[in-house]
Amino acid sequence: MSWKDTAEPLLVRMPAVQRPEGHVPFKRKLTWTGGVLLLYFFLTNVKLFGLDIDASQQVFGRFSSILASGQGSIMQLGIGPIVTASIVLQLLGGADLLGLNTQDDPRDQILYQGLQKLLVLVMICLTGLPMVFAGGFLPADTAVANSLGIGTAGVQWLIFAQMFVGGVLILFMDEVISKWGVGSGIGLFIVAGVSQRLVGGLLTAPFLGNSEGIIYTWYLFITGERGTGPVLAADGLQTVLLQGELLGLFTTVLIFAVVVYAESVRVEIPLSNARVKGARGRFPVKLIYASVLPMILVRALQANIQFLGRILNAQLGSMPAFLGTYANGQPTGGLFYFLAPIQSRGDWMWWLEGTAQPVWQILTRVGIDLFVMLVGGAVFAVFWVETTDMGPEATAKQIHNSGMQIPGFRQNVGVIEKVLERYIPQVTVIGGALVGLLAVMANMLGTIGGVSGTGLLLTVSITYKLYEEIAEEQLMEMHPMMRQMFG
């Protein structure tokens, strides 16, 4: 008896959002999407009952925007468990250990979806329990424990229960948008979090109870309330570029432009319809073929490694120096320091006197981060293409089933697949590595609002794809016959 026969009774009974029986009108899709986004914003402002907020620590740091996490809220875990479960499934699927044919076998498709949800529930527990009980990241409020009479341990379990509910909610919110809305729930949650930080980086001011945004900082420069020194001198130029966030603004605009341009770069394979004379089309293989979503997997893997290091440091008191040394919850040496991604200019600009590490250690850390993002971006892009039916074989079947063929070639799935194999694997690797390079460079130069480079890349790419999907939906609303072509 295989593992599929053993696990099938459980996996097929995993709760799921019902698929629409027919076509969902575009306006209704927008309603579902907007409603789920409003619910997400609401839940990120629902604080965990029983949490000592003043003593709590930021768990994910700058990874929070990528993981759509709301610090100290019921959305504390964000999409982290979903992403981690996807990493595990992609690694198992890539090694062909699951034995699931998700392309042609409906039973295996149901088992895969059930296994994914089961893994998400496991990851919610594996991520949430250490936050509450092991690392001291989310301490219980003793006043609440005394008033309820359940002790500190009881309040800790209460905090974990709320986080568990939040993790399950975001899982099904993502599924609702995927089936009834526009775009991907995970992508929209990331866009929502990053957009908040971008707007905050522009508009915040001390009198609003926040730090200084770009507009307020330049108001101080222009009115003379804050001096810059001679702009042509080194100190003055540094003040304008760094404190005035001109460098961050330039990087943000540059990333927007590069991603939009990269999304438009493509190889177009001509197609024709064998049954309808004169009907022609093109299949685009974009430079960023796998999208930037696989980059979430790379950053989530790094976030989990850093999370593990902080837990070990909290539990052991002090780890062996070769593993890691910590100050204020951040690695300052050892293996975990070298594996920590570059998050800001202060992590590597040693000439600003903001780093305590020797130059060789800083450069080694930069090199490791660059290597991880380039190789990881390419590898996870390949996994993503294969597991989302975007590979040559699955795409060839889709083209063949739609009645299209490549002019000058026989109408055969194998022939179409061979043509696609000339482009898709190579473009996937190049695009994944390019996205990794852009993410590292954006982090090193800094962006508006302290948004991570990966978060900015994700936001731009997801927004661009959302625009394309909305245009496609509107086209299908105007021409219902197009629904069969788009699927």
Curated annotation (Swiss-Prot):
GO terms for cellular component: plasma membrane. Keywords: Cell membrane, Membrane, Protein transport, Translocation, Transmembrane, Transmembrane helix, Transport. One of its GO terms (biological process) is intracellular protein transmembrane transport. The chain crosses the membrane at residues 21-47, 60-88, 111-135, 154-178, 185-203, 245-266, 292-313, 365-384, 428-446, 452-466. It is found in: Cell membrane. InterPro entries: SecY (IPR026593), SecY/SEC61-alpha (IPR002208), SecY_CS (IPR030659), SecY_dom_sf (IPR023201), Translocon_Sec61/SecY_plug_dom (IPR019561). Residues 48-59, 136-153, 204-244, 314-364, 447-451 are extracellular. Coiled coil: none annotated. Gene3D superfamilies: SecY subunit domain. Its main location: membrane. Residues 60-67, 68-79, 80-88 dip into the membrane without crossing it. It is a multi-pass membrane protein. PROSITE patterns: SECY_1, SECY_2. Residues 1-20, 89-110, 179-184, 267-291, 385-427, 467-487 are cytoplasmic. Belongs to the SecY/SEC61-alpha family. Component of the Sec protein translocase complex. Heterotrimer consisting of alpha (SecY), beta (SecG) and gamma (SecE) subunits. The heterotrimers can form oligomers, although 1 heterotrimer is thought to be able to translocate proteins. Interacts with the ribosome. May interact with SecDF, and other proteins may be involved. HAMAP family: SecY. The central subunit of the protein translocation channel SecYEG. Consists of two halves formed by TMs 1-5 and 6-10. These two domains form a lateral gate at the front which open onto the bilayer between TMs 2 and 7, and are clamped together by SecE at the back. The channel is closed by both a pore ring composed of hydrophobic SecY resides and a short helix (helix 2A) on the extracellular side of the membrane which forms a plug. The plug probably moves laterally to allow the channel to open. The ring and the pore may move independently. This is Protein translocase subunit SecY. It comes from Haloarcula marismortui (strain ATCC 43049 / DSM 3752 / JCM 8966 / VKM B-1809). The lineage of its organism: Archaea, Methanobacteriati, Methanobacteriota, Stenosarchaea group, Halobacteria. The gene is secY.
